[in-house]
Amino acid sequence: MDAKLYNLNDMVRVNCNDCQGCFSCCQGMGESIVLDPYDIWQLENNLNTTFAGLMQEKIELNIENGLILPNLKMCGTLDTCGFLNEDRRCGIHKFRPGLCRLFPLGRKYESGELRYFLLEDACTYSAQTKAKVKKWLDIADGRKYENFLIAWHDLRKELQDKIGNSSDEAVKEINLRFLHIFYEKQYLADDFYVQFEERMKRFKG
């Protein structure tokens, strides 16, 4: 890991020639590409589907520190992402999940702030050039997105801490409610952040 931390306006060496001829980060990722509500909102509205529809073959549920979360599903003999097309290119590139956009960067949450770091040797392309972090992420209104990520990170941590001290029945209730409010309930095409805030209030109410 590069010890340096970056913000949205910093330049970092991540450009990789548009991943020409390479799909290494779309293969053999196991359960690591965890999806947040923003990712689900993007997938549902751009693919005209539902969470249940995505669960049929593109995503799956797994447990992370006691909390049930969806992730992209690897499949086939090459163990690749289900959204990889016949040309071995991302079929959802314009609305790909946040962790896919991020790579080869990582996120560091500290004292209510979000910074980025470079994962050394994570990308196999050897001649990377510099790009501004916010351009690399390519998400409209980066500050709003970061505020969402911080709130989501804090909620997950809070729930995972709570789960560690709860009975099996309580853990089941937490997970069922969490999944229903933030994932299973259909997202509208309207402003995601407004919908997320409403769901946060409902969950904590």
Question: What are these language model-derived features?
Answer:
Residues 1-205:
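Short loop/turn segments that flank or connect secondary-structure elements
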